[in-house]
């Protein structure tokens, strides 16, 4: 949304339409013939930003991205001739935008008010800040096409901002700027094609509703490691995957999406707060600058790899719809540089409610629960922009966009239209459970209803790096499922009447639930669990289960048979060690020490069972 024309600048009256009717955020204007769908307009004397969403004859229906009080019939409407676009260039990382990419910090400094004034017209990326530009191996006379890398800007210590030729440009280089400091408006590249000369600065403008082109889509094969044990082990997502986190209020959706943005193995994070409470965004803004990530032994603030699109519930409804598109376009831009990007959308239900409100104002036919009939198609067109791709241009590189969408169905009802439409599209479903959250079991992921369709795609990765992992995961799922089946019997007849092997299943399931699936995201040792620690914990717990069952089954016929009570009484120390594996701190103890401790515990296990059977 670069600086648009003002009404006072326009000298031709034919460029004006006039307001015909106002209904909340929807304005109808007449004498608008010649305008295009999704064209940006400025409405009224306050010059509010709006977008044309319907054309009939010379009447245009406009959704306005700001408060429309004070707009009257007969006010001028200025056409700008551009679609809703975002500015792409150095300066995105670490900034906070609203739904149509207005920089909130700059607006605050300009107006020294906590509110955004009407019709504020300020560039999205700073025009005065200069960036150190280094050309790559592009010289005068080189031939370049869309997507080629021609320069580097060290935007900050975490992100190298690679400058790309815009996707539709091509030609022979006539001029490339020498290394030095430039602002985003300075011309740093000139190309010539068919006698036509084009000048390019660091800044690109791209329409948000249009996906950025790629060479081809690739199958995903690398996991998106979240640092949450239950997700990494049982329901993994891939880099370039789509995930939904539905859950009622207070189940911890926001905490999971924040944990993803803090600890996942992504290069760039785009966090879109779309219609959620303002306090949640301010919590992100308070926490993120203090958090750090260690890259190559250097500690850096996480804010350096994050951009926030804040469109909270007290901002105008229409901009909520745009904020999701703004976020995904920013993500695609960083993907084109060859980065792995994660985009968090919190929450897509509020976005769907914005669609519902605007659809209602347009008097369209409502479908299920009053949502528009095209809800599924809109959701799909958003989630389809995720994926791992081969980027346009040279040098060859791969990037990915992973989308994690939080869904807040009213009352935690998963048959809600938004949830069911989302589940038909996404490949990973992390279902949050109100009952688990009330028991203070966090992350409150219900391991019986959640699923991931990427298991098969990740088998190669596990075979190469963690060979023992896949059978362990299968065993965990079996134990948890068996425990669910046994729990009904236990409620009827009590634990004492169960078979010995079933008692072991129940106890190991309890161990898994309390000390493996549960994770305290506010503690130093457990807020992030690396994958080697996850696998090590699983190996010891399942090793204990297998050995205990083996001991019980082999001595079932003999005179001194081993029962669960015998095992529990003689192995109190080992059970305590199993449940305290999570207290190993990956930062303080380091990978080698934790692995050695886990291997030692496994040997102690084997020794203890040998002693027991003798």
Swiss-Prot record:
Keywords: ATP-binding, Hydrogen ion transport, Ion transport, Nucleotide-binding, Translocase, Transport. The keyword Nucleotide-binding applies. It catalyses: ATP + H2O + 4 H(+)(in) = ADP + phosphate + 5 H(+)(out). ATP binds at residues 247-254. One of its GO terms (cellular component) is proton-transporting V-type ATPase, V1 domain. GO terms for molecular function: ATP binding; ATP hydrolysis activity; proton-transporting ATPase activity, rotational mechanism. InterPro entries: ATP-synt_VA_C, ATP-synth_a_Xtn, ATP_synth_asu-like_sf, ATPase_a/bsu_AS, ATPase_F1/V1/A1_a/bsu_N, ATPase_F1/V1/A1_a/bsu_N_sf, ATPase_F1/V1/A1_a/bsu_nucl-bd, ATPase_F1/V1_b/a_C. The keyword Repeat does not apply. ATP hydrolysis occurs at the interface between the nucleotide-binding domains of subunits A and B. ATP hydrolysis triggers a conformational change in the subunits D and F, which induces a shift of subunit d. The c-ring is subsequently rotated and results in a continuous proton translocation across the membrane. Its EC number is 7.1.2.2. GO terms for biological process: ATP metabolic process. Catalytic subunit of the V1 complex of vacuolar(H+)-ATPase (V-ATPase), a multisubunit enzyme composed of a peripheral complex (V1) that hydrolyzes ATP and a membrane integral complex (V0) that translocates protons. V-ATPase is responsible for acidifying and maintaining the pH of intracellular compartments and in some cell types, is targeted to the plasma membrane, where it is responsible for acidifying the extracellular environment. HAMAP family: ATP_synth_A_arch (MF_00309). Belongs to the ATPase alpha/beta chains family. V-ATPase is a heteromultimeric enzyme made up of two complexes: the ATP-hydrolytic V1 complex and the proton translocation V0 complex. The V1 complex consists of three catalytic AB heterodimers that form a heterohexamer, three peripheral stalks each consisting of EG heterodimers, one central rotor including subunits D and F, and the regulatory subunits C and H. The proton translocation complex V0 consists of the proton transport subunit a, a ring of proteolipid subunits c9c'', rotary subunit d, subunits e and f, and the accessory subunits VhaAC45 and ATP6AP2. This is V-type proton ATPase catalytic subunit A.
């Amino acid at each position: 949304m670069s600086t648009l024309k003002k009404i006072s600048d326009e000298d031709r009256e034919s460029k004006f339409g006039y307001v015909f009717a106002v209904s909340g955020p929807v304005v109808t204007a007449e004498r608008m013939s010649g305008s295009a769908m999704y064209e940006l307009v400025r409405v009224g004397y306050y010059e509010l930003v709006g977008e044309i969403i319907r054309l009939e004859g010379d009447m245009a229906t406009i959704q306005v991205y700001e408060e429309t009080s004070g707009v009257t019939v007969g006010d001028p409407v200025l056409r700008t001739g551009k679609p809703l676009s975002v500015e792409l260039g150095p300066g995105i990382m670490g900034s906070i935008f609203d739904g149509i990419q207005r920089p909130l910090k700059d607006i605050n400094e300009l107006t020294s008010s906590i509110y955004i004034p009407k019709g504020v017209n300020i560039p999205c990326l700073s025009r005065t800040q200069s960036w150190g530009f280094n050309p790559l191996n592009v010289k005068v006379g080189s031939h370049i096409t869309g997507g080629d890398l021609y320069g580097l800007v060290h935007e900050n210590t975490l992100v190298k901002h690679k400058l790309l030729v815009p996707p539709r440009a091509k030609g022979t280089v006539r001029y490339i700027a020498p290394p030095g400091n430039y602002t985003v408006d300075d011309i740093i590249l000139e190309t010539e094609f068919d006698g036509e000369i084009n000048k390019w600065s660091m800044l690109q403008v791209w329409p948000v509703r249009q996906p950025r082109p790629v060479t081809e889509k690739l199958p995903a094969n690398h996991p998106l490691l979240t640092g949450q044990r239950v997700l990494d082990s049982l329901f993994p997502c891939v880099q370039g995957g789509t995930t939904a986190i539905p859950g009622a209020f207070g189940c911890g959706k926001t905490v999971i999406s924040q944990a993803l943005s803090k600890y996942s193995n992504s290069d760039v994070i785009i966090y879109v707060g779309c219609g959620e409470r303002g306090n949640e965004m301010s919590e992100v803004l308070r926490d993120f600058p203090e958090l750090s990530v260690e890259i190559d032994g250097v500690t850096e603030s996480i804010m350096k790899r994050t951009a926030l699109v804040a469109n909270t519930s007290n901002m105008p409804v229409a901009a909520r719809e745009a904020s999701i598109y703004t976020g995904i376009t920013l993500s695609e831009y960083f993907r084109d540089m060859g980065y792995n990007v994660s985009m968090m959308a919190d929450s897509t239900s509020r976005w769907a409610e914005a669609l519902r409100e605007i659809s209602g104002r347009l008097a369209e036919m409502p479908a299920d629960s009053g949502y528009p009939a095209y809800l599924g198609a809109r959701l799909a067109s958003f989630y389809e922009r995720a994926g791992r791709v081969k980027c346009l241009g040279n040098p060859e590189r791969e990037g990915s966009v992973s989308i994690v969408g939080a869904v807040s169905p009213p009352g935690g009802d998963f048959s809600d239209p938004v949830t069911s439409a989302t589940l038909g599209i996404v490949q990973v479903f992390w279902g949050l459970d109100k009952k688990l959250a009330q028991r203070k079991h966090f992350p409150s992921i219900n391991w019986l209803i959640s699923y991931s369709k990427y298991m098969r795609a990740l088998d190669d990765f596990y075979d190469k790096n963690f060979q023992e992992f896949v059978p362990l995961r299968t065993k965990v799922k079996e134990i948890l499922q068996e425990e669910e089946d046994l729990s009904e019997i236990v409620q009827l007849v009590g634990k004492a009447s169960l078979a010995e092997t079933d008692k072991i299943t129940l106890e190991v399931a309890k161990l898994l639930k309390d000390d493996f699936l549960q994770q305290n995201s506010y503690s130093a040792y457990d807020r992030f669990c690396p994958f080697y620690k996850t696998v090590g914990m699983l190996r010891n717990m399942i090793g204990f289960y297998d050995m205990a069952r083996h001991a019980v089954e082999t001595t079932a016929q003999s005179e001194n048979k081993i029962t669960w009570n015998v095992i529990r009484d003689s192995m109190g120390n080992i059970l305590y060690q199993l449940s305290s594996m999570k207290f190993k701190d990956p930062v303080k103890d380091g990978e080698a020490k934790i692995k050695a401790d886990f291997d030692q515990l496994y040997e102690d296990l084997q020794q203890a069972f040998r002693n027991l059977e003798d």
